[in-house]
Amino acid sequence: MLSASDLRKGLKLDIEGSPYIIIDFDFSKPGKGQALYRCKMRNMITGNQLVKTYRSSDKFEKASLEERKMQFLYSQGEEYHFMDNENYDQLFITKDMLGDNIYFLQDNMDVDVLFFDEKPIDITLPIFVNLEVTRADPWVKGDTSGTDTKPITVETGYQLQVPPFVEQGDKIQIDTRTGQYVTRVKQ
């Protein structure tokens, strides 16, 4: 059991049988009475947000989550298939659950899959992925309509802004946390 003083951003709790992650946290101590802990939380299954205020005497149950190393195998329609690296069991995760992570998945990529009650609820990708540029419009020197970036599309269909020197066929490194360009990869 956790007490209210253990609450912090990023902590995963079991609230009414569902896993929640604390995304914002505020502590206040009024002149009289107990300290109050105000938590903004996100349901890790539905994505719904919840704001609750707790007293210092409240107790909490840590969410029973399990993380497993898995390998992405392939996608088929709306399903993305993964294999457990330890026992070789296979499972699929829907496109809706993966969200924008689908743009960074590559065949045979190792990922961490988070489970709650033996059901996958989230994946953690490597921080950086290298993807090939499949479409890059030419950049016109002297185009002063804004910043010195241009839109491109990579092999997975993801679109982003990159410096003008990036050309079609180049491999680039992308930060999976932000979806932004990091550097061009030497081939």
UniProtKB/Swiss-Prot annotation:
Biological pathway: Protein biosynthesis; polypeptide chain elongation
Gene3D superfamilies: 2.30.30.30, Nucleic acid-binding proteins (2.40.50.140)
Compartments where located: Cytoplasm
Residues forming coiled coils: none
InterPro entries found in the cross-reference section: Elong-fact-P_C (IPR015365), NA-bd_OB-fold (IPR012340), Rib_uL2_dom2 (IPR014722), Transl_elong_fac_P/YeiP (IPR020599), Transl_elong_KOW-like (IPR013185), Transl_elong_P/YeiP_cen (IPR001059), Transl_elongation_fac_P (IPR011768), Translation_prot_SH3-like_sf (IPR008991)
BP terms from Gene Ontology: peptide biosynthetic process
Primary localization class, coarse: cytoplasm
Disulfide topology: none
One Pfam family linked to the record: Elong-fact-P_C
Entry keyword annotation includes Cytoplasm: yes
Keywords: Cytoplasm, Elongation factor, Protein biosynthesis
Family: Belongs to the elongation factor P family.
Function: Involved in peptide bond synthesis. Stimulates efficient translation and peptide-bond synthesis on native or reconstituted 70S ribosomes in vitro. Probably functions indirectly by altering the affinity of the ribosome for aminoacyl-tRNA, thus increasing their reactivity as acceptors for peptidyl transferase.
Protein's UniProt name: Elongation factor P
Lineage, uppermost ranks: Bacteria, Pseudomonadati, Thermodesulfobacteriota, Desulfobulbia, Desulfobulbales
Gene behind the chain: efp
